[in-house]
Regions:
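Cytosolic, long alpha-helical scaffolding segments
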Residues: 1-214
Length: 214
């Protein structure tokens, strides 16, 4: 009877499968957001991909939160699991807000700094995807995990620099001659910076988990 009961309960390993699925959705969303910034027809086409992947990520997040409540033994602290999946979900939620802003303001041209910030977003998503399976072996992969989270934090710092450089150039180019253009560009920069900030949050949660287990 007890064996049958345990068979119905979510398995510890399932969390890592769910984290992996979520990270795949996040990466696909990041790649679609970057493709949007190529402009032209790519904007509308990739906008829908961002929306779809955000919905996929939401579905996985719900599965994780349900599994946390139903699982007797979790791979690490329940609060850490919630924090991790929430931070990952926040990253793609912010991508969705960015994509919506691009559509709302009908933006079809993007600066080199915006594109480089989007490149950083894709790289952050790739690093998260690399880090997720390593959480299944925290003790032996602590150094590798710490390196990946440090790379994400470095990308966040670079994105801040790109934001400031791009915004300064935009101000000199459009603040007087095209105030609306400056406002819209500022919004895009702000959204892109927030996406990278959310990835830095993911890195901080992962780093905290590593510290607790070594």
């Amino acid at each position: 009877m007890l064996r049958w009961f345990h068979a119905l309960m979510p398995k510890e390993e399932r969390f890592f499968d769910l984290f992996a699925r979520h990270s795949q959705a996040v990466l696909a969303g990041a790649q679609a957001l970057r493709a949007m910034l190529e402009g032209g027809a790519a904007v509308e086409r990739n906008y829908q991909i961002v929306m779809d992947r955000e919905h996929d990520a939401d579905d996985v997040t719900r599965e994780v939160l349900i599994a946390v409540r139903r699982t007797f033994i979790t791979p690490f602290d329940r609060g850490n699991i919630r924090d991790l999946i929430t931070s990952m979900d926040n990253s793609i939620d912010q991508m969705q807000k960015t994509a919506k802003g691009v559509i709302l303001f009908d933006v079809t041209e993007f600066t080199p700094q915006m594109k480089e910030m989007a490149d950083a977003i894709v790289k952050c998503a790739q690093l998260v995807q690399q880090a997720v399976p390593l959480l299944n072996s925290i003790s032996s992969e602590a150094v590798h995990l710490s390196d990946l989270t440090a790379q994400i934090s470095a990308l966040e710092g670079r994105a801040d620099e790109l934001h400031d450089i791009g915004l300064r150039e935009l101000y000199h180019a459009k603040s007087k001659s095209d105030p609306m253009g400056f406002f819209v560009g500022n919004e895009v920069y702000d959204h892109l910076e927030k996406v990278v900030d959310r990835f830095d949050d993911v890195a901080n949660v992962m780093h905290g988990i590593v510290i607790e287990h070594v």
